[in-house]
């Protein structure tokens, strides 16, 4: 995937969104974002270097944004979404960005109604010892204390 410098997340505190933000932070990107409320997840992202605000206000958006990742949990009527759309800044759903990242990697997908996080965590644990991997787990896996595992 092409390197981008400045990525903005709308709904950065969500479990899937925060995993993507952590991935891009580790890759050396500048990460900015909005969420409705602070949480342990957003605090951890801020410790890692993300700039996050909790007020719907376009003045908190940095001057340079290469693209936006959003979750459908944030309505398209949100001031910031409207701003990005009006300024022709590319906006991608979380799932599309996950697809961009994984498109050039061997991939195992886990689907279903119940047990996806547990199953993904088990697969990650098994493969982690012998193979470098990138795993988006879908929840905070206790054995990794993370929702994303990135081996270099």
Residue ranges and their predicted role:
Residues 11, 54, 112:
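Pocket-edge structural micro-motifs
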Residues 1-51, 64, 68, 86-89:
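ATP-dependent carboxylate-amine ligase
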Residues 35, 55-56, 94-95:
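Short beta->alpha connector loops at strand-helix junctions that form conserved
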Residues 3, 23-29, 46, 59-63, ...:
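Phosphate-binding loop of NTP-binding sites
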């Amino acid at each position: 995937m092409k390197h981008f410098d400045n990525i903005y997340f709308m709904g950065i505190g969500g479990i899937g969104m925060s995993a993507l933000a952590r991935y891009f932070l580790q890759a050396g990107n500048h990460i900015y974002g909005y969420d409705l409320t602070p949480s342990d997840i957003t605090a951890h992202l801020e410790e890692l270097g993300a700039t996050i605000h909790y007020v719907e206000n376009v003045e908190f958006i940095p001057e340079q944004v290469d693209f936006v990742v959003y979750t459908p949990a944030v309505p398209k009527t949100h001031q910031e979404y409207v701003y990005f759309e009006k300024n022709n800044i590319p906006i991608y759903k979380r799932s599309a960005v996950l697809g961009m990242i994984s498109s050039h990697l061997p991939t195992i997908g886990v689907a279903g109604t119940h047990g996806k996080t547990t199953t993904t965590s088990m697969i990650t644990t098994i493969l982690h010892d012998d193979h470098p991997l990138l795993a988006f787990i879908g929840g905070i896996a206790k054995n990794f204390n993370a929702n994303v595992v990135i081996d270099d």
